[in-house]
Protein backbone atom coordinates (compact mmCIF):
# COMPACT_ATOMS: atom_id res chain seq x y z
CA UNK A 1 0.00 0.00 0.00
CA UNK A 2 1.43 3.35 -1.02
CA UNK A 3 2.30 5.66 1.83
CA UNK A 4 -0.66 7.81 2.90
CA UNK A 5 1.45 10.96 2.63
CA UNK A 6 1.99 10.29 -1.07
CA UNK A 7 -1.74 9.69 -1.56
CA UNK A 8 -2.52 13.00 0.10
CA UNK A 9 0.15 14.82 -1.90
CA UNK A 10 -1.87 14.04 -5.04
CA UNK A 11 -4.23 16.77 -3.86
CA UNK A 12 -1.76 19.24 -2.37
CA UNK A 13 -0.74 22.71 -3.51
CA UNK A 14 2.75 21.34 -4.16
CA UNK A 15 1.30 18.82 -6.59
CA UNK A 16 -0.51 21.48 -8.59
CA UNK A 17 2.48 23.83 -8.66
CA UNK A 18 5.10 21.18 -9.54
CA UNK A 19 3.76 17.64 -10.03
CA UNK A 20 6.77 16.22 -11.85
CA UNK A 21 8.80 15.00 -8.83
CA UNK A 22 5.72 13.08 -7.67
CA UNK A 23 5.20 11.66 -11.17
CA UNK A 24 8.79 10.40 -11.17
CA UNK A 25 8.26 8.76 -7.79
CA UNK A 26 5.02 7.12 -8.91
CA UNK A 27 6.58 5.84 -12.14
CA UNK A 28 9.18 3.97 -10.13
CA UNK A 29 6.95 2.74 -7.28
CA UNK A 30 3.33 2.61 -8.48
CA UNK A 31 2.91 3.52 -12.18
CA UNK A 32 -0.74 2.37 -12.10
CA UNK A 33 -2.11 3.58 -8.80
CA UNK A 34 -5.58 3.22 -7.33
CA UNK A 35 -6.24 6.50 -5.54
CA UNK A 36 -9.16 7.22 -3.23
CA UNK A 37 -8.22 10.90 -3.43
CA UNK A 38 -9.49 11.11 -7.02
CA UNK A 39 -11.77 8.09 -6.85
CA UNK A 40 -10.00 6.32 -9.69
CA UNK A 41 -6.71 5.23 -11.22
CA UNK A 42 -3.61 7.34 -11.84
CA UNK A 43 -1.28 6.44 -14.69
CA UNK A 44 2.19 7.98 -14.93
CA UNK A 45 4.23 5.66 -17.18
CA UNK A 46 4.54 6.69 -20.83
CA UNK A 47 3.72 3.31 -22.34
CA UNK A 48 0.57 2.93 -20.20
CA UNK A 49 -0.61 6.47 -20.91
CA UNK A 50 -0.03 6.05 -24.63
CA UNK A 51 -1.93 2.76 -24.76
CA UNK A 52 -4.93 4.19 -22.89
CA UNK A 53 -5.18 7.37 -24.96
CA UNK A 54 -4.94 5.43 -28.23
CA UNK A 55 -7.41 2.68 -27.29
CA UNK A 56 -10.83 4.24 -27.83
CA UNK A 57 -12.37 0.76 -27.99
CA UNK A 58 -11.59 0.21 -24.31
CA UNK A 59 -11.38 3.73 -22.89
CA UNK A 60 -13.85 6.55 -23.47
CA UNK A 61 -13.71 10.34 -23.21
CA UNK A 62 -17.46 10.36 -22.62
CA UNK A 63 -19.21 10.45 -19.28
CA UNK A 64 -16.48 11.46 -16.86
CA UNK A 65 -18.11 14.74 -15.76
CA UNK A 66 -21.64 13.36 -15.79
CA UNK A 67 -20.36 10.47 -13.65
CA UNK A 68 -19.12 12.98 -11.07
CA UNK A 69 -22.32 15.03 -11.25
CA UNK A 70 -24.39 11.92 -10.59
CA UNK A 71 -22.49 11.38 -7.34
CA UNK A 72 -24.12 14.52 -5.93
CA UNK A 73 -27.38 12.62 -5.44
CA UNK A 74 -30.79 12.45 -7.07
CA UNK A 75 -32.35 15.55 -5.51
CA UNK A 76 -30.02 18.05 -7.16
CA UNK A 77 -29.93 16.44 -10.63
CA UNK A 78 -32.98 18.30 -12.05
CA UNK A 79 -31.15 21.56 -11.28
CA UNK A 80 -28.06 20.51 -13.24
CA UNK A 81 -29.61 19.76 -16.61
CA UNK A 82 -27.44 22.16 -18.62
CA UNK A 83 -24.23 20.76 -17.16
CA UNK A 84 -25.35 17.22 -17.95
CA UNK A 85 -26.29 18.25 -21.48
CA UNK A 86 -23.05 20.15 -22.09
CA UNK A 87 -20.69 17.51 -20.73
CA UNK A 88 -22.46 14.58 -22.39
CA UNK A 89 -21.54 15.69 -25.91
CA UNK A 90 -19.23 17.90 -27.90
CA UNK A 91 -15.65 17.82 -29.09
CA UNK A 92 -14.03 17.27 -25.69
CA UNK A 93 -16.52 14.64 -24.56
CA UNK A 94 -16.93 12.34 -27.54
CA UNK A 95 -15.25 9.32 -29.09
CA UNK A 96 -14.65 8.29 -32.68
CA UNK A 97 -16.37 8.45 -35.10
CA UNK A 98 -18.39 11.31 -33.58
CA UNK A 99 -15.25 13.10 -32.41
CA UNK A 100 -13.77 12.83 -35.90
CA UNK A 101 -16.90 14.32 -37.47
CA UNK A 102 -17.00 17.29 -35.07
CA UNK A 103 -13.29 17.91 -35.42
CA UNK A 104 -13.53 17.88 -39.22
CA UNK A 105 -16.37 20.41 -39.23
CA UNK A 106 -14.48 22.72 -36.88
CA UNK A 107 -11.24 22.40 -38.86
CA UNK A 108 -13.13 23.38 -42.01
CA UNK A 109 -14.21 26.60 -40.28
CA UNK A 110 -10.60 27.65 -39.70
CA UNK A 111 -9.68 28.64 -43.25
CA UNK A 112 -6.10 29.68 -44.14
CA UNK A 113 -7.36 33.22 -44.67
CA UNK A 114 -8.95 33.32 -41.21
CA UNK A 115 -5.83 31.90 -39.57
CA UNK A 116 -3.59 34.45 -41.27
CA UNK A 117 -5.90 37.28 -40.23
CA UNK A 118 -5.93 35.90 -36.70
CA UNK A 119 -2.13 35.88 -36.66
CA UNK A 120 -2.05 39.60 -37.44
CA UNK A 121 -4.77 40.36 -34.92
CA UNK A 122 -2.94 38.49 -32.15
CA UNK A 123 0.14 40.60 -32.88
CA UNK A 124 -1.90 43.82 -32.71
CA UNK A 125 -3.62 42.92 -29.45
CA UNK A 126 -0.37 41.68 -27.90
CA UNK A 127 1.47 44.89 -28.76
CA UNK A 128 -1.43 47.00 -27.49
CA UNK A 129 -1.63 45.07 -24.22
CA UNK A 130 2.13 45.09 -23.62
CA UNK A 131 2.28 48.84 -24.24
CA UNK A 132 -0.01 49.38 -21.23
CA UNK A 133 2.16 47.43 -18.80
CA UNK A 134 4.08 49.23 -16.10
CA UNK A 135 7.74 48.51 -15.38
CA UNK A 136 6.56 46.05 -12.70
CA UNK A 137 3.35 44.25 -13.64
CA UNK A 138 1.38 41.12 -12.87
CA UNK A 139 1.87 39.19 -16.11
CA UNK A 140 -0.98 36.75 -15.44
CA UNK A 141 -3.58 39.37 -14.55
CA UNK A 142 -2.51 42.14 -16.92
CA UNK A 143 -1.27 40.27 -19.99
CA UNK A 144 -1.65 36.51 -20.06
CA UNK A 145 -5.33 36.46 -19.04
CA UNK A 146 -6.79 39.35 -21.07
CA UNK A 147 -4.77 38.64 -24.24
CA UNK A 148 -6.05 35.12 -25.06
CA UNK A 149 -9.51 35.97 -23.72
CA UNK A 150 -9.83 38.87 -26.14
CA UNK A 151 -8.49 36.88 -29.08
CA UNK A 152 -10.76 33.88 -28.51
CA UNK A 153 -13.68 36.22 -27.82
CA UNK A 154 -13.13 38.06 -31.10
CA UNK A 155 -12.72 34.72 -32.86
CA UNK A 156 -16.28 33.91 -31.78
CA UNK A 157 -17.51 37.33 -32.85
CA UNK A 158 -18.01 38.95 -29.45
CA UNK A 159 -17.07 42.54 -28.63
CA UNK A 160 -14.35 43.71 -26.26
CA UNK A 161 -17.03 44.78 -23.78
CA UNK A 162 -18.24 41.18 -23.56
CA UNK A 163 -14.85 39.75 -22.56
CA UNK A 164 -15.18 40.24 -18.76
CA UNK A 165 -18.50 38.37 -18.83
CA UNK A 166 -17.00 35.55 -20.90
CA UNK A 167 -14.07 35.25 -18.48
CA UNK A 168 -16.43 35.12 -15.48
CA UNK A 169 -18.57 32.42 -17.07
CA UNK A 170 -15.55 30.39 -18.13
CA UNK A 171 -13.93 30.60 -14.69
CA UNK A 172 -17.13 29.26 -13.12
CA UNK A 173 -17.34 26.32 -15.52
CA UNK A 174 -13.62 25.52 -15.31
CA UNK A 175 -13.78 25.96 -11.53
CA UNK A 176 -16.38 23.23 -11.21
CA UNK A 177 -13.98 20.79 -9.58
CA UNK A 178 -12.89 20.46 -5.98
CA UNK A 179 -9.62 18.91 -4.85
CA UNK A 180 -9.05 15.48 -6.28
CA UNK A 181 -11.24 16.27 -9.27
CA UNK A 182 -14.53 15.82 -7.42
CA UNK A 183 -17.50 18.20 -7.70
CA UNK A 184 -19.37 19.97 -4.90
CA UNK A 185 -23.07 20.80 -5.08
CA UNK A 186 -22.39 24.49 -4.46
CA UNK A 187 -19.93 24.81 -7.34
CA UNK A 188 -22.11 22.70 -9.62
CA UNK A 189 -25.14 24.93 -9.10
CA UNK A 190 -23.06 28.06 -9.67
CA UNK A 191 -21.54 26.59 -12.83
CA UNK A 192 -25.02 25.62 -14.02
CA UNK A 193 -26.18 29.23 -13.69
CA UNK A 194 -23.10 30.61 -15.44
CA UNK A 195 -23.36 28.04 -18.24
CA UNK A 196 -26.96 29.11 -18.77
CA UNK A 197 -25.92 32.75 -19.12
CA UNK A 198 -23.11 31.84 -21.50
CA UNK A 199 -25.34 29.67 -23.71
CA UNK A 200 -27.88 32.48 -23.86
CA UNK A 201 -25.16 34.92 -24.94
CA UNK A 202 -23.76 32.54 -27.57
CA UNK A 203 -27.29 31.81 -28.76
CA UNK A 204 -27.74 35.49 -29.58
CA UNK A 205 -24.50 35.49 -31.57
CA UNK A 206 -25.69 32.45 -33.53
CA UNK A 207 -29.13 34.01 -34.15
CA UNK A 208 -27.52 37.20 -35.44
CA UNK A 209 -25.37 35.23 -37.90
CA UNK A 210 -28.37 33.24 -39.11
CA UNK A 211 -30.28 36.45 -39.72
CA UNK A 212 -27.41 37.73 -41.86
CA UNK A 213 -27.45 34.42 -43.71
CA UNK A 214 -31.16 34.79 -44.49
CA UNK A 215 -30.48 38.23 -45.92
CA UNK A 216 -27.59 36.96 -48.03
CA UNK A 217 -25.06 39.03 -46.08
CA UNK A 218 -23.08 36.25 -44.40
CA UNK A 219 -19.76 35.39 -46.03
CA UNK A 220 -18.71 32.79 -43.48
CA UNK A 221 -15.38 34.55 -42.97
CA UNK A 222 -16.43 37.06 -40.31
CA UNK A 223 -15.65 34.77 -37.36
CA UNK A 224 -15.79 31.10 -36.37
CA UNK A 225 -19.50 31.13 -35.53
CA UNK A 226 -20.22 32.65 -38.94
CA UNK A 227 -18.11 29.95 -40.59
CA UNK A 228 -19.98 27.22 -38.72
CA UNK A 229 -23.40 28.72 -39.51
CA UNK A 230 -22.43 29.04 -43.18
CA UNK A 231 -21.89 25.27 -43.42
CA UNK A 232 -25.64 24.81 -43.10
CA UNK A 233 -27.03 21.28 -42.98
CA UNK A 234 -23.57 19.81 -43.59
CA UNK A 235 -22.29 21.40 -40.39
CA UNK A 236 -23.31 21.34 -36.76
CA UNK A 237 -26.79 21.15 -35.30
CA UNK A 238 -27.99 24.12 -33.24
CA UNK A 239 -27.12 22.38 -29.95
CA UNK A 240 -23.73 21.29 -31.26
CA UNK A 241 -22.98 24.82 -32.40
CA UNK A 242 -23.79 26.27 -28.97
CA UNK A 243 -21.76 23.61 -27.17
CA UNK A 244 -18.81 24.04 -29.53
CA UNK A 245 -18.74 27.82 -29.14
CA UNK A 246 -18.91 27.54 -25.35
CA UNK A 247 -16.15 24.91 -25.34
CA UNK A 248 -13.90 26.98 -27.61
CA UNK A 249 -13.91 29.88 -25.18
CA UNK A 250 -13.99 27.95 -21.91
CA UNK A 251 -11.17 25.62 -22.98
CA UNK A 252 -9.33 27.95 -25.33
CA UNK A 253 -8.53 31.02 -23.32
CA UNK A 254 -7.63 29.48 -19.94
CA UNK A 255 -5.39 26.78 -21.39
CA UNK A 256 -3.52 29.46 -23.32
CA UNK A 257 -3.16 31.58 -20.19
CA UNK A 258 -1.78 28.62 -18.25
CA UNK A 259 0.55 27.58 -21.07
CA UNK A 260 2.01 31.08 -21.36
CA UNK A 261 2.24 31.40 -17.59
CA UNK A 262 4.06 28.08 -17.23
CA UNK A 263 6.31 28.99 -20.14
CA UNK A 264 7.29 32.36 -18.74
CA UNK A 265 7.93 30.86 -15.32
CA UNK A 266 10.26 28.30 -16.90
CA UNK A 267 12.03 30.98 -18.93
CA UNK A 268 12.53 33.28 -15.95
CA UNK A 269 14.35 30.41 -14.28
CA UNK A 270 16.54 30.07 -17.38
CA UNK A 271 17.55 33.61 -18.45
CA UNK A 272 20.12 32.25 -20.89
CA UNK A 273 17.28 30.90 -23.05
CA UNK A 274 15.59 34.31 -23.07
CA UNK A 275 18.89 35.79 -24.21
CA UNK A 276 19.18 33.23 -27.01
CA UNK A 277 15.64 33.95 -28.23
CA UNK A 278 16.27 37.69 -28.10
CA UNK A 279 19.32 37.39 -30.34
CA UNK A 280 17.98 34.59 -32.53
CA UNK A 281 14.24 35.21 -33.09
CA UNK A 282 14.08 32.29 -35.54
CA UNK A 283 14.20 30.03 -32.47
CA UNK A 284 10.96 31.40 -31.01
CA UNK A 285 8.56 29.15 -32.96
CA UNK A 286 10.31 26.02 -31.69
CA UNK A 287 10.55 27.58 -28.23
CA UNK A 288 6.77 27.96 -28.00
CA UNK A 289 6.24 24.36 -29.11
CA UNK A 290 8.78 23.16 -26.56
CA UNK A 291 7.03 25.16 -23.82
CA UNK A 292 3.83 23.23 -24.56
CA UNK A 293 5.71 19.94 -24.28
CA UNK A 294 7.87 20.85 -21.30
CA UNK A 295 5.14 22.11 -18.96
CA UNK A 296 1.77 22.12 -20.69
CA UNK A 297 -1.37 23.69 -19.30
CA UNK A 298 -3.28 20.38 -19.06
CA UNK A 299 -0.85 17.64 -17.94
CA UNK A 300 -3.52 14.98 -17.64
CA UNK A 301 -6.40 13.45 -19.56
CA UNK A 302 -9.33 11.51 -18.13
CA UNK A 303 -10.81 8.32 -19.51
CA UNK A 304 -13.52 5.87 -18.40
CA UNK A 305 -13.07 2.14 -18.94
CA UNK A 306 -15.78 0.74 -21.21
CA UNK A 307 -15.08 -2.82 -20.10
CA UNK A 308 -12.97 -4.75 -17.62
CA UNK A 309 -9.34 -4.57 -18.65
CA UNK A 310 -5.78 -4.78 -17.38
CA UNK A 311 -3.00 -2.18 -17.38
CA UNK A 312 0.45 -3.40 -16.39
CA UNK A 313 -1.03 -5.99 -14.06
CA UNK A 314 -3.66 -3.70 -12.50
CA UNK A 315 -7.27 -4.85 -12.93
CA UNK A 316 -9.47 -1.98 -14.15
CA UNK A 317 -13.22 -2.52 -13.98
CA UNK A 318 -15.75 -1.19 -16.46
CA UNK A 319 -16.96 2.26 -15.41
CA UNK A 320 -13.85 3.14 -13.43
CA UNK A 321 -12.11 6.45 -14.09
CA UNK A 322 -8.47 6.76 -15.09
CA UNK A 323 -6.32 9.89 -15.00
CA UNK A 324 -3.52 9.60 -17.54
CA UNK A 325 -0.70 12.06 -16.95
CA UNK A 326 0.91 13.24 -20.13
Show where each model-derived region lies.
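Cytochrome P450
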Residues: 1-325
